[in-house]
A protein has these predicted regions:
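Short glycine-rich anion-binding loops that position phosphate/pyrophosphate groups of nucleotides
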Residues: 78-80, 151-155
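Generic preference for hydrophobic
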Residues: 58, 74, 97-98, 204-206
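Membrane-anchoring hydrophobic helices of lipid-metabolizing enzymes
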Residues: 1-72
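Anionic-ligand binding region
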Residues: 128, 132-136
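Residue-level preference for the first positions of well-ordered beta-strands
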Residues: 71-73, 143-149, 177
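Short gly/ser/thr-rich secondary-structure transition/capping motifs
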Residues: 52-59, 129-130, 186-189
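Catalytic core of membrane glycerolipid acyltransferases/transacylases, capturing the structured
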Residues: 18-27, 36-39, 66-126
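A cross-family acyltransferase "interaction/gating" segment
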Residues: 108-111, 145, 156-221
Length: 241
């Protein structure tokens, strides 16, 4: 209770301010560039990381912070919406997320999603899903950084759920490197606490890039291989927790 009261008092004014600014920017995209809109969202995400007292323990943080002209596909496991907040707070280069279309109907969230040009996928439509995979892949090929939560939805367990077919399709069109990202304890920043407002430790690992050649050599097993790499690191995090 104490934690959420503090978060509401500290975060709500900032989110409301961001909402108003982005509503204006989204209506005048010819005047406000994508990079400028992303900076507004990023500043809000950095503030949310701060007010939730989230301490990110990161392996290979230079991978996401380094300047790079080529596009990438970040492939992450998924426990919490706060993973997107942390990724945006870390990346100066704009990130484009692939998200289920239902999220685009959530107040406040939809405004921020629109500002950072989130690509929405309809999981009930195979045709639309294929179109989204192609669009995301082409944008990565054109030097954009794409973020995919490859399980398709948040894991209800403490393990990584099987990866969906979208991953190899996107990499096929992207023809670029893939960065695997493992999150551990990423539900903690938004966990309800009754009588405390503690620092929340989240463990993150950015893997070394997987080349497009690796995909070509492992097409049939690609989703399984990448899933197992992240699961192995998650198991390591859990053993050390």
């Amino acid at each position: 209770m104490i934690k959420w009261l503090c978060i509401i008092l500290l975060a709500v004014p900032r989110v409301l301010y961001s909402q108003i600014v982005l509503l204006i920017m989204n209506c005048k995209k010819d005047k406000y560039s994508y990079e400028r809109r992303y900076r507004v969202v990023r500043n809000t995400c950095k503030w949310l990381v701060k007010v939730t007292r989230t301490k990110m323990n990161i392996e290979n943080v230079d991978i996401i912070k380094s300047r790079h002209e080529n596009g990438r596909v970040y492939v992450c496991n998924h426990f919490s919406v706060f993973e997107a907040v942390m990724l945006i707070s870390l990346s100066e280069k704009p990130l484009i997320f692939i998200s289920k279309k239902e999220n685009s109907k959530v107040p406040f969230l939809r405004t921020h999603m629109k500002a950072v040009e989130t690509i929405c996928i309809d999981r009930e439509s195979v045709k639309q899903s294929l179109k989204v995979c192609k669009e995301a892949g082409i944008r990565a090929k054109d030097n954009a950084d794409i973020v995919l939560f490859a399980e398709g939805t948040r894991s209800k367990t403490e393990d990584v759920s099987p990866f969906k077919a979208a991953l190899p399709m996107i990499v096929h069109y992207a023809e670029t490197e893939v960065i695997l990202v493992c999150f551990h304890n990423s539900k903690n920043p938004v966990k309800f606490r009754w009588l405390s407002y503690p620092k929340e430790n989240v463990n993150i690992k950015f893997f070394e890039p997987l080349s497009y050649q690796y995909y070509l050599e492992n097409k049939k097993e690609y989703a399984i291989l990448t899933h197992d790499m992240i699961q192995s690191k998650l198991d390591e995090f859990k053993r050390g927790n």
